[in-house]
From Swiss-Prot:
The lineage of its organism: Bacteria, Pseudomonadati, Pseudomonadota, Gammaproteobacteria, Alteromonadales. It comes from Shewanella oneidensis (strain ATCC 700550 / JCM 31522 / CIP 106686 / LMG 19005 / NCIMB 14063 / MR-1). It catalyses: pseudouridine(1915) in 23S rRNA + S-adenosyl-L-methionine = N(3)-methylpseudouridine(1915) in 23S rRNA + S-adenosyl-L-homocysteine + H(+). Homodimer. The gene is rlmH. NCBIfam families: PRK00103.1-1 (NF000984), PRK00103.1-4 (NF000986), tRNA_RlmH_YbeA (TIGR00246). SUPFAM superfamilies: alpha/beta knot. Its main location: cytoplasm. This is Ribosomal RNA large subunit methyltransferase H. GO terms for cellular component: cytoplasm. S-adenosyl-L-methionine binds at residues 73, 104, 123-128.
Amino acid sequence: MKLQLIAVGTRMPDWVTRGFEEYQRRFPRDMALELIEIPAGKRGKNADIVRILQKEGEQMLAAIPKGNHIVTLDLPGKNWTTPELASAMNKWQLDGRDVSLLVGGPEGLAPACKEAAHQSWCLSALTLPHPLVRIVVAESLYRAWSVNTNHPYHRE
């Protein structure tokens, strides 16, 4: 199974890239984690946020291979404990499809992305900076993988 993190925003600070890559490289080849960056729409004083969200959403959906299981990261989503995420990951594997996880920009995800989703995951009730979300998602997925494979990374 391939995990695909599709996130709005490019040119992240070096610490974000290093943090994400630290967890990305830990995954085995049969559970690869890929990052796809979608350029953020230009936001200014008179920006048309609805149009920006729509364009970002179109680009995100276009990046998803046909047949992938789609999970949005969104506040109204389900809060998963590590064992619950591990269980969800197990189900994704048994389903036999790759998974695309969508992280929106400053205004969140386009309605089209939310409508296309099969599941929605809420990382926290806190507002997290979008660059940090990449690292938290990568670590959480790695931890869930470690639970499923009895790897010593996760301890109860």
